Amino acid sequence: MKNKILFILTLLMILPLSSCYNKENREEILKVYNWADYIDEDVLANFPAWYKQQTGKKIRIIYQTFDINEVMLTKIERGHEDYDVVCPSEYIIERMLRKDLLLPIDTAFGKTPNYLKNVSPYIVEQIDATSNNERIAHHYAVPYMWGTCGILYNKVHVPLKDAQTWGTLWNRKYRGKLLMKDSYRDSYGTALIWAHRKDLEAGKVTVPELMNDYSPNAVAMVEKNLKALKPNIEGWEADFGKETMTKGKAYLNMTWNGDAVWAIEEAKNVGVEL
């Protein structure tokens, strides 16, 4: 059963919470909080000059990265960081809207006014599902990329027949050989999907319904399944899993499709089959 977990990354405008930059004009600073490896360093280095050429104004970029959505949210909420733009997964939008942490965005997009018209209606629908208190999510967030979560495996140690379902993660043949993504959303969803696999196959429930089920029974089921998974887990990773897999040091990695593609291509260069 090849059920996949959808994730959508978005760009958001953050409600200013503080502004202490001594003599520097805050309007001349662009603070960005993003996942690592998402924007090329050359783009960041060249942006101030490009911006000056386009607008006649100077800008300085403060660029910081995170590897876990909840860490990002905590830093903004409790640390009172006044980022201008952040890039969380879609389920975080609902929390940020509820906590009044976001500002509406200008959807004209400069020289690309048709940007939103070309976005998949399905993606916009998924984002708007996080709308809160009459605040339409796509008024506060712009789709940046989307993907799925799945299993990356070493072909030498894991035969194809073993890699057909989420149950691969619980297979005791791979004790101590599994890297799990350090993302509660993905781990939670994976555990529920596997637990309800028969209901999914029978059409009694959908993946989105499971992903948003936080009832006591669902939480208890996730706890039970993740505890059963523990013997197989070599470690929890937010970013290093793809490199570990390219070195052949782990057999399985529950990971995001972008990281999986990168790892597969890199592994070819060193003779590792993923």
Predicted features by range, described:
Residues 6-11:
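Sec-dependent N-terminal signal peptides
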Residues 1-4:
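Positively charged n-region of N-terminal signal peptides that target proteins for export
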Residues 92-95, 252-272:
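A ligand-binding cleft/hinge motif common to bilobed small-molecule-binding domains
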Residues 21-99:
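Early extracytoplasmic/lumenal segment of secretory-pathway proteins
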Residues 16-19:
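C-terminal motif of bacterial Sec signal peptides marking the signal peptidase cleavage site
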Residues 83, 174, 250, 271-273:
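Local beta-strand N-terminus motif with an aromatic residue
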Residues 38-41, 97-249, 263:
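Extracytoplasmic ligand-binding site segments that recognize negatively charged/polar headgroups
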Residues 83-88, 234, 251-256:
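Paired acidic/hydrophobic, glycine-rich loop segments that form the ligand-binding mouth/hinge
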